[in-house]
UniProtKB/Swiss-Prot annotation:
Protein name per the record: Bifunctional protein GlmU
Region (Pyrophosphorylase): 1-223
Keywords of this entry: Acyltransferase, Cell shape, Cell wall biogenesis/degradation, Cytoplasm, Magnesium, Metal-binding, Multifunctional enzyme, Nucleotidyltransferase, Peptidoglycan synthesis, Repeat, Transferase
Region (N-acetyltransferase): 245-432
Catalytic site: 336
Pathway listed: Nucleotide-sugar biosynthesis; UDP-N-acetyl-alpha-D-glucosamine biosynthesis; N-acetyl-alpha-D-glucosamine 1-phosphate from alpha-D-glucosamine 6-phosphate (route II): step 2/2; Nucleotide-sugar biosynthesis; UDP-N-acetyl-alpha-D-glucosamine biosynthesis; UDP-N-acetyl-alpha-D-glucosamine from N-acetyl-alpha-D-glucosamine 1-phosphate: step 1/1; Bacterial outer membrane biogenesis; LPS lipid A biosynthesis
Pfam families: Hexapep, NTP_transf_3
Catalytic activity: alpha-D-glucosamine 1-phosphate + acetyl-CoA = N-acetyl-alpha-D-glucosamine 1-phosphate + CoA + H(+); N-acetyl-alpha-D-glucosamine 1-phosphate + UTP + H(+) = UDP-N-acetyl-alpha-D-glucosamine + diphosphate
GO biological process: cell morphogenesis; cell wall organization; lipid A biosynthetic process; peptidoglycan biosynthetic process; regulation of cell shape; UDP-N-acetylglucosamine biosynthetic process
Length: 432
């Protein structure tokens, strides 16, 4: 396949989203919509230009978190609004240039490869059951002959179900020669990229239609369409993992973000959320658990466990209502209702119900270090920083405020006190 330049249009405000967030930064599976257009474009080209305008600094800053090898230009929206105005002033590196939209997060590189057709313009089209609401594309003898907007279409033209999908490939020479000829003599006073199609037809150029998959070329203009697109994207992610051998219980209830990795003989149960750069290796994530930006290897989590960013679990059991954050646990059992944050716990250690690492003093976070074969009784608080050596027993109800040496018993508990007959005296005094 010959090299080509790619321009991605991402300048619009997206007013139908009804949001202060720029349209292309609304997220699907944890990443901005624009991320996906760029990701797929980079599979085809090393000359990527993203056209911005609305909140361009915010969009640029967000996208630069993911990509460093693309170009950004700011559209002269005041003088040259519209899709045609967006590509003005760009000089593509290669002889062909593909123009994509930043609000098509379902686009895939293998579909874009199909634009490799010998023509002045290759225009993506949809074959629909009903093209109501779309501009119609008139095709004769395999060539595009006309584009007509629905409001301008004749009765016969309205019967046509071939519609414009909104992505084009141009010969760069034609594009650069004809962009200066565009005008804004229309109701919106904008410069339209579709006018280049009319110019090419009038010049007798070859314009080829490319029938594309409607799902892949779905544009997102509202939050309803955003939700619809995310459902499709989620299904794609989960099917790829299941094909690779991952078991998923009721996959429609599972949410997996872009960037998550799942390897080996892993089981993901219903209601699970895997977020950020979570990595699951040979592990069982049980019902309604959340794993975010953490590594879980040869372990089980949940049900209703929460593994927060920076955790690393190896050969570990995390039970119901246990939360970890920045916790390195190796060969640990924490079965019930505990918070383990900013800690390192070694193999053979059992964490009793209600254990808390008190890691924050109101200003700074502090570490709790627990060694091997430590038994932590229920309702224990570790007031960090503390270091618990190997083979230690922590009595239930203890508040640990200092280091504990190997082999010791640590116990902080008030002496029990009983008062004979107190119940009867206490309540009888209230009955009058």
């Amino acid at each position: 396949m010959g090299k080509k330049s790619i321009i991605i249009l991402a300048a619009g405000a997206g007013t139908r989203m009804k949001s202060d967030t720029p349209k292309v930064l609304h997220k699907i599976s944890g990443k901005p919509m624009l991320y996906y257009s760029i990701k797929e474009a980079l599979k085809l080209s090393d000359d990527i230009t993203v056209v911005l305008y609305h909140q361009f600094e915010k969009v640029k800053a967000e996208i630069e978190k993911y990509f460093s090898n693309i170009n950004f230009v700011i559209q002269d929206h005041k003088n040259y609004p519209g899709t045609g105005g967006a590509v003005m002033g760009i000089t593509p590196k290669y002889e062909k240039v593909l123009v994509l939209n930043g609000d098509m997060p379902l686009i895939q590189a293998n579909e874009l490869e199909k634009f490799e057709i010998n023509a002045t313009i290759v225009m993506s089209v949809l074959e629909l059951e009903s093209a109501d609401g779309y501009g119609r594309v008139i095709i004769e003898n395999g060539n595009v002959k006309k584009i007509v907007e629905q409001k301008d279409a004749s009765e016969d033209e309205l019967k046509i179900t071939t519609a414009n999908a909104g992505i084009y490939q141009f010969e760069t020479k034609f594009l650069l020669e004809n962009l200066p000829k565009l005008d804004n003599n229309n109701a919106q006073k904008e410069y339209y990229i579709t006018d280049l199609v009319e110019m090419a037809i009038s010049q007798g150029k070859v314009l080829k239609p490319l029938v594309v998959n409607e799902e892949n070329f779905k544009g997102v203009n509202s939050k309803v369409e955003l939700a619809d697109a995310e459902v499709i994207h989620q299904n794609r992610i989960k099917k790829e993992f299941m094909k690779a051998g991952v078991i998923m219980r009721l996959p429609d209830t599972i949410y997996i973000e872009e960037g998550v990795e799942i390897e080996g003989e892993s089981i993901i149960e219903n209601g699970v959320s895997l977020l950020g750069n979570a990595k699951i290796i040979n592990s069982h994530i049980k019902t309604n658990s959340v794993v975010e930006d953490s590594i879980v290897k040869d372990s089980d989590v949940g049900p209703m466990g929460r593994v927060r960013p920076g955790s690393e679990l190896t050969n570990t059991h995390i039970g119901n209502f246990v939360e970890t954050k920045k916790a390195k646990l190796t060969g640990v059992k924490a079965g019930h209702l505990s918070y383990l944050g900013d800690c390192s716990i070694d193999e053979g250690t059992n964490i009793g119900c209600g254990t808390i690492t008190c890691n924050y003093d109101g200003v700074n976070k502090h570490q709790t270090i627990i060694g091997k074969n430590v038994f932590v009784g229920s309702d224990t608080q570790f007031v960090a920083p503390v270091n618990i050596e190997d083979d230690v027993l922590i009595g239930a109800g203890s508040t640990v405020t200092g280091n504990v040496k190997k082999g010791e018993l640590y116990l902080t508990r008030a002496k029990a006190k009983t008062i004979d007959g107190f119940f009867y005296k206490h309540f009888s005094s209230k009955k009058k």
